């Protein structure tokens, strides 16, 4: 057995066990204790394992920074990035924003991370990211954890109405001249309670959702202050929304 073969087997043992003794290496490879120690020393020097007393440990790989999904594979990713960047530029220093769940919401939170603004969210993937990145001001809305959406939902009539931000950014499954539609009723109802206390409601949807009607009506068009969407959005729907006082930004 060559040295390279021994090293490969030793590393495979560590991958399975996490720790091996010199005695175990000798037994498995049929080599002398001196050869086993020499192999461990070489692999330690090359950074492939950690040498410890009477054996070796597997090196714990640093966990990659977590994101809720492979964002680059999200539908209409590039358009959503442009939408998030445009939305982040609306917020001034010292203001507070409410950001809800979804891929666009996460992209927006990532854009705003590190800026001198307060971010209020019930979306745990975003909250975890902001905390990991040491964003100065993060408020996590409390409640029962909803596994399917990775959010917290508080009981009806609870303190969520106290989370009044200058801005509320939200998305949905469809937007028509009637308003914004969401398919998850629990999350929609939880967010609806904040509509009366936020300063401005900004809807972030990619162009594929313009003209779509799915689920429940979350907010009427006349409740929406601004829509940020893609350049391919249905112009007829956009005109109807503008006629109802919605500011339109296409990116």
UniProtKB/Swiss-Prot annotation:
One of its GO terms (biological process) is negative regulation of DNA-templated transcription. SMART domains: DeoRC (SM01134), HTH_DEOR (SM00420). Residues 20-39 bind DNA. Residues 3-58 form the HTH deoR-type domain. Keywords: Cytoplasm, DNA-binding, Repressor, Transcription, Transcription regulation. One of its GO terms (molecular function) is DNA-binding transcription factor activity. It is found in: Cytoplasm. InterPro entries: Carb_Metab_HTH_regulators, DeoR-like_C, DeoR_HTH, NagB/RpiA_transferase-like, Tscrpt_reg_HTH_DeoR_CS, Tscrpt_reg_HTH_UlaR, WH-like_DNA-bd_sf, WH_DNA-bd_sf. One of its GO terms (cellular component) is cytoplasm. It comes from the Bacteria. NCBIfam families: PRK13509.1 (NF010034). Represses ulaG and the ulaABCDEF operon. This is HTH-type transcriptional regulator UlaR.
């Amino acid at each position: 057995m060559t040295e390279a073969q021994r090293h490969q087997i030793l590393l495979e043992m560590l991958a399975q066990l996490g720790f091996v003794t010199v005695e175990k290496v000798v037994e498995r490879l049929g080599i002398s204790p001196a050869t086993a120690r020499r192999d461990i020393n070489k692999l330690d020097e090359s950074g492939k394992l950690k040498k410890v007393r009477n054996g070796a440990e597997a090196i714990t790989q640093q966990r990659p920074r977590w994101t809720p999904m492979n964002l680059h594979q999200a539908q209409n990713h590039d358009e959503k990035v442009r939408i998030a960047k445009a939305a982040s530029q609306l917020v001034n220093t010292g203001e507070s924003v409410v950001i809800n769940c979804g891929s666009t919401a996460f992209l927006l939170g990532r854009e705003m991370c590190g800026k001198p603004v307060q971010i209020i969210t019930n979306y745990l993937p975003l909250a975890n990211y902001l905390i990991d990145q040491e964003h100065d001001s993060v408020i996590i809305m409390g409640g029962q954890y909803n596994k399917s959406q990775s959010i917290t939902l508080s009981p009806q009539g609870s303190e969520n109405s106290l989370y009044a931000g200058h801005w509320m950014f939200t998305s949905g499954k469809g937007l028509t001249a009637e308003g914004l539609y969401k398919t998850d009723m629990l999350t929609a109802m939880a967010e609806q309670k904040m509509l009366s206390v936020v300063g401005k409601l900004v809807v972030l949807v990619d162009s594929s959702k313009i003209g779509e009607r799915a689920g429940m009506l979350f907010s009427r068009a006349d409740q929406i202050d601004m829509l940020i969407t893609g350049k391919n959005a249905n112009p007829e729907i956009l005109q109807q929304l503008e006629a109802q006082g919605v500011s339109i930004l296409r990116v």
